[in-house]
Amino acid sequence: KLAGDRRASGVVILHRGKILAEQYWKPDEGARAGNKEREYGALVRGRDAAGQVIEDVASVQKSIAAILVGMARHQGLLGLDDPVTKHLGPGWTKASPEQEQAITVLHLLTMTGGLKDDLTFEAAPGTRWRYNSAAYARTLQVVAAAAKKTPNALTREWLTGRIGMGDSSWVERAGAGGEAGLNALGFATTARDLARFGLLILADG
């Protein structure tokens, strides 16, 4: 009940790797109740075999992207101290070439790249923290470029296909691309698939 009151769409509780409790709320419940904050129907991207929603999980995808960066690093495809320009080329920000060159993969992961939301320069990398989804979204692009694979191909090969997250994939977000295609992809998944991901993290990968 608490999760539903906090506008959750679903919750799965695991104990020793097994489902202890599971509950879902319909996408239109908030709309019927007149609660605009509970409306998340626009995030629904389908349903799994059990009829539960597959939805864009918004900023939860940052954890997925971070794990993929770690996997790419483990394979020697990139380093955390690599300039982002090494993988994306110049011009991925609106900063000067010198300012842009100083931003590393680690800066993106720690949100200390020194960029504003529109990717203009704000501060020297590493000197200021700013929650920046637009900049963080570039981490997935970095991994894809380093691996020479599409986001869905590498995610399926490295992660979702290996641990049984069969209802998870990257999906295009209509109208979310913006001028530079920022946040153009969202990670669509289910509560059960995220539970599998949680078990992976709990087991130290």
Residue map of PLM features:
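Active-site-proximal alpha-helical segments within enzyme catalytic domains
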Residues: 135-142, 185-205
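Aromatic- and histidine-enriched alpha-helix N-cap/loop-to-helix transition segments
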Residues: 6-9, 55-64, 100-103, 129-137, ...
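Active-site-proximal beta-strand/loop segments in catalytic clefts of secreted hydrolases
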Residues: 14-16, 23-25, 60, 111-113, ...
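Amphipathic alpha-helical interface segments
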Residues: 122-136, 142-143
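Active-site helix/loop module of the DD-peptidase/beta-lactamase fold
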Residues: 46-47, 51, 56-59, 74-115, ...
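Generic structural signal for alpha-helix termini and adjacent loop/cap motifs
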Residues: 1, 75, 111, 200-204
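Active-site SXXK
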Residues: 17, 37-42, 51-81, 139-144, ...
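A short, well-structured edge-of-sheet supersecondary motif
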Residues: 3-47
